[in-house]
Regions:
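N-terminal beta1-alpha1-beta2 submodule of the flavodoxin-like/Rossmannoid cofactor-binding fold
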Residues: 1-106, 173, 177-201
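FMN-binding flavodoxin-like domain, especially the glycine-rich phosphate-binding loop
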Residues: 92-93, 99-201
Length: 201
């Protein structure tokens, strides 16, 4: 069993997102699962895709650093993403990572004029921090838009059908007890997800 964690936050060591990552890693390792963390800011990942790279990807020519990310994703049974929601979307670092890594021929292909996802058989969970309340986001339908476009929409397109996500809201104003409850929830969901996958393997 292989678990890949993709983390994007510029305050990569002291943010609440990092605390989530640490709990997810611990829960995974306690089950004896091989666990890999890709901390995009600490890695200084280059999120900018060039036109040359875009053209080359369609010909199967992939930069070495992207091939490495392909290997991590290819081997993963569970992919966990941890990131803040900024301007109703991914941080630019994570968006650029996905632009470069979910390349044609790896994440999807084209057959008879239609796209087909190539990442079947993988599960995904996302833990997303937001500055406002979850209830307010739900009131305006933001959660549904995120789900349709950036969460299930994007990853279903690439063949990942088993996608769960959790919004953690008001992270700048809640107290330590509330934060601890969120961390416990992230750990419990990770344990449950991996336990179910282990039972199927």
């Amino acid at each position: 069993m292989n678990h890949l964690i993709i983390f994007a936050h510029p305050n990569s060591q002291k943010s609440f997102g990092r605390a989530i990552v640490d709990r997810v890693v611990k829960a995974s390792q306690q089950l004896g699962v091989e666990t890999h963390l890709r901390d995009l800011y600490t890695m200084e990942f280059n999120p900018i895709i060039s036109f040359e790279e875009l053209q080359s990807a369609s010909k199967g020519i992939i930069p070495a650093e992207i091939q490495q990310e392909h290997d991590f994703i290819r081997q993963a049974d569970l992919i966990t993403m941890v990131y803040p929601l900024w301007w109703m979307g991914f941080p630019a670092m994570l968006k650029g990572y996905l632009d470069r890594v979910l390349s044609h021929g790896f994440a999807y292909k084209t057959e008879n004029g239609e796209s087909k996802g190539l990442l079947q058989g993988k599960a995904m969970q996302q833990f997303i921090t937001i500055g406002s309340s979850v209830a307010k986001y739900q009131e305006y339908g933001v959660d549904k838009s995120l789900n349709h476009c950036l969460i299930n929409g994007l990853f279903n397109y690439c063949g990942i059908e088993n996608v769960d996500y959790t919004l953690f809201g008001d992270i700048h104003i809640i107290d330590d007890a509330a934060r601890q409850a969120m961390l416990d929830e992230a750990a419990e969901k990770t344990t449950a997800k991996l336990t179910a996958l282990l039972a199927q393997s």
